Each structure stands twice: as structure tokens, then as C-alpha cells.
Amino acid sequence: MSTLEQWLQVACAELGIDPASVDLRAVLDLTRDVARGVDRPAAPVTAYLLGVAVGRGLAPADGIARLTGLAGSWAAQHPAGEQPGA
């Protein structure tokens, strides 16, 4: 078991979450896309926002799809090095 998988088990136990309910690959893909297409610090913030939305009833897959799409459109509208509002 990798360190990430071990951490997932421990963190889920701490929060009372079934580890099987976490689509780890999808979350990692989302954070990768946000880090590359938006900004690195936006990745963990986006993961947190996804968690808040899921806690409020949004289906995880729907949230991931919406945020991945948003990150893709952001990257297309804001070429590398271009700062919005600058």
C-alpha cells in the first residue's frame, strides 16, 4: 500500500468516511488539471470546494466534471503567463 493509500485510510477513519466512497483517481486528475490549467495553489482550494459542494448534496462525479470543465475553459481563456485583470 502506497503512502497516499495509507493516508487516505487514516484520514477517512478520522473523518468517519468510507474510503471506498472516495474516487481518488478522479480527485487527483481534477487537482492536476487545475494546477496545470489555472494555478498550483488553486488545486487544493478546488478540492476543498468540491468537498463542500458534495457535503451539500452535489454528486461527486458531477462536481468533478463541472470543475474539470471550468479549469479547461480557464486555461483556454487565460494563456500561460497571462494574469486576469492585469
Walk through the language-model features, giving the residues of each:
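Predominant activation on well-ordered alpha-helical scaffold segments within soluble catalytic domains
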Residues: E5, Q9, R32, T46-V52, ...
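C-terminal binding/interaction regions
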Residues: Q9-C12, A61-A86
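Amphipathic, hydrophobic secondary-structure cores in small proteins
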Residues: P19-G57
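An acidic intrinsically disordered interaction segment
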Residues: M1-R25
